[in-house]
Regions:
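Positively charged n-region of N-terminal signal peptides that target proteins for export
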Residues: 1-5
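Bacterial N-terminal signal peptides
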Residues: 7-16
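Structural signature of tandem-repeat unit edges
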Residues: 28-37, 47-69, 79-94, 101-118, ...
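Consensus positions within tandem repeat domains that build extended binding/scaffold surfaces
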Residues: 72-74, 94-97, 143-145, 165-168, ...
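Non-globular, low-complexity intrinsically disordered regions
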Residues: 40-41
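Small beta-barrel nucleic-acid-binding modules, principally OB-folds
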Residues: 216-217, 540
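Boundary at the C-terminal end of the N-terminal hydrophobic targeting segment
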Residues: 19-26
């Protein structure tokens, strides 16, 4: 069966949720940026040649990013890449980053079976000694550096190394011993998969493989209730160590553990209870991803970090109280945790990333702290029973789909200083009755309030609104009166389409153009008085407004679009000077 890697999980998450990372080019090299941590990873650069010097920091826009890693296959196949200088800030080099490069193909770059770049062990070959002592002064070992090497029998790691990266010793069939120093703080996924140690049944105890106090893997013999036991205290769990163990129901993590690594309990679908000790300071990405029966996972009061998608689709997870030490909730942390009703957010929280609470269909209440500065796309989308939300003043822009599909949300309190309401921010909030638009607001996004069926009124004046985008208030079926903001010059397509209760619209003095279908099927509208600024009425702008009886057109009008007033049954077709461009069927179905 094909193994599901962390890369696969990330790809799936990014398919569902918007990416929080972005790419940028700096001095002819491509980087992937992490805005949460202001770090950069050297991305795929397949055209690299000659000599390259990676900088320690790059500047993109207003931010300075520290370059910390080289991506998987970053320079793979760059045969003309002869030299590369890596900064001290690099702490990870992913698998195959330099495969097929001129650096790897040049035999002069190899020493005793090892390829080194700036004190980083990149790769090994069959000429390595069977017992290899990694020298002190080695900065790090690249992911997969020993992978598939059949020569090595024993590896002694130095105290200067802090991480064994993913697939480092994978498929090393003759490897029987690795000396892991206490300085090692993390072990990547599949670091020992199918190596000689892994294949030796005598090394396994009760379904777990433990090396020098590090639990590196588990198998099908793992009991339903796992208690950490070893001659040495278990101080470390490898990434994905318990992943997909369907038999696992209960885990008591000992107080010798300080970190729960990435995907540690990924898709343990029958896991119901996890005891996390107070010693744990970091819970990394996807740690409990897809643990659908998990009910209890009490987080330590002094937890410092909660990673991306930690409780993603933990459908039975109950109330959570988050440590005040946490400043960022990363992407998809509680995505589709259907049974969470309440959650206590950190007092110093600054950022809620994309989709953090999306699909939390039982979440009744959430109090956002005043320290909050950023809310990501879909942060509360699909929180079907959430009733109210108050956005703190530090938030200056509402993201896309922030509360989309919050079908019972009836009130949204927006802060002074708000600049924009994002696309579909409140779309499908069927019971939304009250929302204040601050004076500072510049833009209301595409379908921002689409299908808010109980929204009776919304004050667009006095505000700084320059843009109301397509379908912003489409299908707001209870909306009765609208006064357009004074700075608005163009009314976008379908803005008030199918607002079937809309009776009056007060146009401003600067409006020049009304977009396609802007008031389509506003069937309770009876009278229109345009100001002298109006020049263009778009296609189907007022089509199907069946009770529209009177329209006063200004002399400034230049074009009336196709089917602009089609099927306005109560409207008598007006006469226009010949210089006005009138589209086909503009008044079809009106009284003559």
């Amino acid at each position: 069966m094909k193994r599901i890697t962390l890369f696969t999980i990330l790809s799936a998450l990014f398919y569902i949720l918007p990416l929080s990372a972005e790419e940028a080019t700096y001095q002819d090299l491509r980087y992937t940026l992490d805005e949460n941590h202001l770090t950069a990873e050297v991305a795929l650069n397949t055209q690299a040649t000659g000599e390259i010097m990676i900088p320690e920091k790059i500047i993109v826009g207003q931010n300075t990013y520290t370059v910390t890693s080289i991506a998987d296959r970053a320079f793979k196949g760059c045969k003309n890449l002869q030299t590369i200088v890596l900064p001290q800030s690099i702490d990870r080099v992913y698998r195959s980053a330099f495969d097929g490069t001129g650096i790897m193909l040049n035999k002069d770059n190899w020493q005793e079976g090892c390829l080194w770049i700036d004190s980083i062990l990149i790769a090994t070959d069959k000429t390595i000694k069977p017992r290899f002592i990694v020298p002190e002064g080695t900065r790090l070992i690249a992911a997969g550096a020993f992978q598939g090497n059949k020569t090595i029998v024993r590896v002694d790691l130095p105290t200067c190394i802090t991480r064994i990266d993913h697939e480092t010793f994978r498929d090393c069939k003759n490897l029987q011993k690795v000396v892991i120093p206490p300085t090692i703080t993390s072990i990547g996924e599949d670091a020992f998969l199918n190596c000689g140690i892994y294949q030796n049944e005598k090394k396994w105890k009760k379904g777990a493989l433990i090396i020098d106090g590090c639990l590196v893997a588990t198998n099908k013999l793992l009991p339903a209730k796992y208690v950490f036991k070893s001659k040495k205290p278990i101080r470390l769990i490898a990434e994905r160590a318990f992943a997909e163990r369907e038999q696992l129901k209960t885990v008591v993590i000992p107080n010798t553990i300080t970190v729960i690594p990435a995907a540690a309990f990924y898709q343990c679908e029958n896991l119901t209870n996890v005891t996390i000790p107070a010693t744990v300071s970091h819970v990394h990405k996807f740690a409990f991803y897809g643990c659908k029966l998990l009910k209890q996972a009490t987080l330590p009061t002094h937890l410092k970090y909660l990673g991306m998608g930690v409780f993603y689709e933990c459908e039975n997870l109950r109330e959570q109280v988050l440590s005040d030490s946490i400043e960022i909730l990363e992407q998809g942390t509680f995505y589709k945790c259907h049974t969470i009703k309440q959650i206590t957010l950190p007092a110093q929280l600054k950022r809620i990333d994309h989709g953090v609470f999306a699909g939390c269909s039982s979440l009744e209440e959430i109090k956002l702290p005043n320290t909050l500065e950023f809310i990501g796309n879909m942060a509360f989308a699909g929180c079907a029973v959430l009733r109210t939300i108050t956005i703190p003043e530090g938030v200056t822009s509402l993201p896309k789909q922030m509360c989309q599909g919050c079908t019972r949300l009836y009130r949204a309190n927006l802060p002074d200083g708000l600049y924009a309401v994002g696309d579909e921010a409140f779309a499908g909030c069927l019971l939304l009755e009250k929302v204040n638009i601050p004076k500072s607001t510049f833009r209301i996004g595409v379908r921002a309030f689409h299908n808010c069926q109980q929204l009776e009124s919304i004050a667009l004046t006095p505000t700084n609104i320059h843009m109301i985008e397509e379908g912003a208030f489409q299908e707001c079926k209870m909306l009765m009166d609208i006064e357009l903001p004074e700075r608005l010059k163009v009314l976008s397509d379908a803005v008030f389409a199918q607002c079937i209760s809309l009776k009056t619209i007060k146009f401003n003095q600067k409006l020049r153009e009304i977009g396609t279908g802007a008031f389509y099927n506003c069937r309770n509208m009876r009278e229109l008085t345009f100001n002298d600024s109006i020049q263009v009425i778009g296609d189907e702008a007022f089509a199907e407004c069946k009770n529209l009886r009177k329209v006063s057109f200004p002399i400034t009008i230049k074009r009336i679009g196709v089917s602009a007033f089609q099927n306005c049954e109560s409207l008598k077709q007006p006469l226009f000077p010949p210089e006005i461009q009138i589209g086909k069927n503009a008044f079809k179905g009106t009284r003559k």
